[in-house]
């Protein structure tokens, strides 16, 4: 999908965890993030909201001279600053309004935008409670964004291990709201959110005794469909809830025009 939009990617040669697994120790977490950020002068794009939030949080901590000096004392490459961007932001910047590369406009497709709790934190780039960047992207694909009250709520993933029932209740509430709002598909910008809403959806249906059956697409998959990329290229057959009926309806709508 990035290639189709002219986005050139260069993977970090020796990346490590973003620091999320060590958040209880702010200095270690900042050091892990700084080690990643120090490896390149290019903007760093991540498709994971957890990584995005941790890298941005670390960058803010590293503005403190004392913290930066303590971290740099143990790094081979010294951290001097970084430009951290989420894939959603880069995609939107690369996709013009009425973009000619959109060969399959997703007209009439009702899409529920789900941000999750970390894309907008730390604050500064997007409104923490009322972000609209995902709705703007959905609009550029000519689909219809569906209002979702829980769009910035946690998916339940971070508490799944210690509090499975609470996590299940949270995830199911998001799915049920999207279904009730008439959404044909949910689009996510975080792999953990995608796991909770897609991979666990059938398990949640069994536990709650209610069928939802709503496909969940990661944002690159939704954009890729509009760009005319094939199901295999986009990994659509790897989704737990098949999005193929949604894709087929999109083609049928185009054929009728």
Stretches with model-predicted labels:
Residues 1-257:
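Iron-sulfur cluster-binding electron-transfer modules in prokaryotic oxidoreductases
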């Amino acid at each position: 999908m990035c290639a189709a939009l002219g986005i050139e990617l260069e993977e970090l040669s020796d990346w490590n965890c973003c620091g999320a697994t060590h958040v209880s120790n702010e200095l270690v977490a900042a050091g892990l993030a700084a080690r990643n950020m120090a490896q390149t002068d290019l903007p760093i794009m991540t498709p994971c909201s957890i990584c995005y939030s941790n890298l941005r949080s670390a960058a803010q901590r590293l503005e403190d001279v004392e913290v930066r000096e303590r971290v740099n004392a143990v790094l081979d490459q010294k951290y001097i600053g970084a430009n951290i961007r989420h894939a959603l932001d880069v995609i939107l910047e690369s996709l013009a309004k009425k973009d000619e590369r959109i060969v399959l406009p997703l007209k009439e497709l009702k899409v529920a935008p789900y941000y999750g709790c970390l894309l907008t934190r730390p604050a500064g780039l997007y409104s923490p409670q009322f972000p609209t960047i995902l709705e703007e992207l959905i609009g550029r694909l000519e689909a219809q964004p569906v209002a979702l009250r829980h769009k910035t709520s946690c998916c339940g993933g971070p508490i799944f291990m210690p509090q499975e029932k609470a996590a299940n209740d949270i995830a199911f509430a998001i799915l049920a709201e999207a279904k009730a709002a008439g959404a044909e598909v949910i689009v996510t910008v975080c792999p953990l959110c995608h796991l909770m809403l897609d991979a666990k959806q059938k398990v949640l249906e069994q536990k709650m005794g209610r069928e939802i059956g709503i496909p969940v697409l990661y944002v690159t998959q939704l954009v890729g469909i509009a760009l005319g990329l094939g199901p295999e290229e986009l990994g659509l057959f790897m989704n737990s809830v098949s999005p193929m009926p949604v894709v087929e309806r999109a083609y049928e709508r185009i054929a009728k025009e």
